[in-house]
């Protein structure tokens, strides 16, 4: 079958409907799937000693623990909730801002297409974790306030999800201070950025595997 690369060039490649049918040994596996499929891929990677780049999101805490404590000790794993370089920069920026705006109320708003399954997005949680770790892991994550009957606490961080249309991905982190606010936003207009980021991760992971 034919399929297009991120650069819009067309290549002929064998496509398998089951990972167990693959005859060649890959140098690195890239996983853009869903948590239920990832563990079959991890099992295959472990059995064949193949490094893996995991770009899938939606893992719960126990699944993440299994990946980190069981599989990562046996094979090289590069795992990220977002393959965008600019999201990495955003994470650094908001962490720095959090140290300077310690009295600010922090809210995160993420927007994605109507077909996205997990909520909130893995990227939103990653951004929240960056801020929380910077502030000593003292923040409470609040995902919905419809049942809240009290004033906002200064030890919480709000995380909100919006779903609609074909929006690829938008993440905003807002710092609310007295009489002013500061908002940092990252907006994705093409999924090509994820492919480029994944290929950079492949290069890094492959080199690590051969150190």
Predicted regions and their residues:
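Structural detector of well-ordered beta-strand residues that form the stable sheet scaffold
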Residues: 16, 53, 76-78
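Active-site-lining helix/loop region of Rossmann-like oxidoreductase modules
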Residues: 16, 98-208
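Single conserved hydrophobic/aromatic residue that forms the stacking wall/gate
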Residues: 1-7, 11, 206-211
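N-terminal glycine-/serine-/threonine-rich beta1-alpha1-beta2 phosphate-ribose binding loop
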Residues: 5-47
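Rossmann-fold NAD(P)-binding glycine/threonine-rich loop
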Residues: 57-76
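Hydrophobic, well-structured mid-protein blocks that either form specific transmembrane helices
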Residues: 71, 78-113
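ADP-ribose/adenylate-binding Rossmann-like module
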Residues: 44-61
């Amino acid at each position: 079958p034919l399929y297009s690369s991120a650069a819009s060039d067309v290549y002929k490649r064998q496509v398998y409907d089951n990972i167990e049918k693959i005859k060649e040994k890959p140098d690195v596996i890239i996983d853009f799937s869903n948590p239920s499929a990832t563990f079959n891929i991890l099992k295959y990677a472990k059995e064949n000693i193949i490094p893996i780049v995991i770009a899938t999101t939606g893992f719960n805490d126990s699944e993440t623990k299994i990946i980190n404590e069981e599989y990562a000790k046996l094979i090289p794993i590069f795992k990220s909730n977002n393959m965008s370089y600019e999201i990495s920069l955003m994470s650094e920026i908001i962490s720095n801002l959090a140290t300077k705006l310690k009295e600010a109320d922090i809210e995160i708003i993420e927007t994605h297409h109507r077909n996205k399954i997990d909520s909130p997005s893995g990227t939103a949680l990653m951004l929240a974790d960056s801020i929380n770790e910077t502030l000593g892991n003292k923040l409470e994550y609040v995902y919905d306030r419809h049942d809240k009957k009290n004033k906002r606490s200064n030890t919480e961080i709000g995380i909100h999800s919006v779903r609609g249309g074909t929006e690829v991905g938008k993440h905003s982190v807002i710092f609310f201070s007295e009489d002013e606010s500061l908002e940092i936003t990252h907006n994705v207009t093409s999924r090509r950025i994820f492919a480029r980021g994944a290929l950079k991760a492949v290069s890094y992971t492959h080199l690590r595997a051969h150190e």
